[in-house]
Amino acid sequence: MNGNNLSFNNLDWFSPEERFNQPGSFAIVEDHQIKAILAATPENPSTAWLRFYHVDRRSDHAKCFANLIGAAKNTLQKMGARGLFALAPYSWLESLLLAEGFKPADTIVTLQRDFPVQSTPENDDEIVIREMTQRDLVVVEEIDAAAFEPAWQLNPVSLERTYHRTAWHSVALLEREIVGYQMSTSIFDTAHLARLAVHPRYQHRGLGRRLAQDMLETFSAFGVTSFSVNTQSSNASSLALYQSLQYQRENHDILVMSLDI
């Protein structure tokens, strides 16, 4: 395929080449050329996501999408998946998804904070924040599965990839037990809180705030001045947390769509 095409890539820690080697990936080939290519691969046994879709503009992109998403659905059904989710940042993609029976499910919102934070001493000696190690991932996987609904969970492979691709990752401990974690990326003077979760048994005790504050303080110490985070518009507690840390909601929400399969 060349640059004359419609393209969508999901927010992902894996490359399109890696995704295309997973079940749920298909291509349409004509005259030895790829006309359209799609990956809709599982994240866990019950849930899959549309990872990417590329189609030559000169092709019937609606027909191509219908054929490819249909093939992916058949594969996912055989694997036991019950839901297929997709981000729809473009109107053309939203139209294609609606035509195949997808419905609006939620909205991803971005929040931004454009000034650093000063380190402040914490009075709660019960909570300990330390750097995450790879050995912690076994517990982090359990926390992630407990804290998120299936559509938003990351499987162990994805969590390990996230760990290796993020610049700062930390865990929160209560009585020497890991009960929460965060992973964040950074480039130049910007940082992004990519993942934060607290085990449901320990939520509403200030752990999420301590982890988010740790991210701000760590990157601020290295000269970072701009911070961002994404969450769902339906997640009121998450929105309240970030806004209490002076993040401001941006005006470029992304629609989340879902299909029962």
Predicted feature locations:
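Conserved acetyl-CoA-binding loop-helix of GNAT-fold acetyltransferases
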Residues: 61-74, 198, 204-217, 221, ...
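Conserved donor-binding loop and adjoining core beta-sheet/short helix segment
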Residues: 11-70, 74, 174, 182-194, ...
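A structural microfeature
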Residues: 36, 106-109, 180, 251
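A short beta-loop-alpha structural element at the N-terminal edge
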Residues: 1, 127-140
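Conserved hydrophobic beta-strand within the GNAT/NAT acetyltransferase core sheet
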Residues: 84-87, 193, 227-231
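Active-site rim helix/loop that mediates acceptor-substrate recognition in acyltransferases
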Residues: 2-30, 148-175, 183
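Acyl-donor-binding surface of acyltransferase catalytic domains
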Residues: 56-124, 253-259
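Conserved active-site alpha-helix within GNAT-family acetyltransferase domains
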Residues: 89-106, 205, 209, 233-251
